[in-house]
């Protein structure tokens, strides 16, 4: 079973977390962050909701491939992966540490793409 939970909503975008089989990896990640790290990501979510993707430089919110994006959490070198759906929805799926060096995360990108396709099949994004 797949569903989405709203994290922040604004005039530009709605930022959500993906829940798969009653597990919300985004919420687990946010809960594990320090209060300072959580505050930074809350600010990013709020800014996305209010201003949309145009409100960021590439290093904070970056499109990786197609609908797959990442949100950079500066304090821990962790990336929160997400996908976009339509003009107004960003769905966060999970987090992962950035590998050393300038490496692409193809496995993470593939995972987000599979979750996006699952959401489309189950009609969650309509």
Predicted feature locations:
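Basic, Lys/Arg-enriched alpha-helical interface segments
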Residues: 1-77, 86-90, 97-126
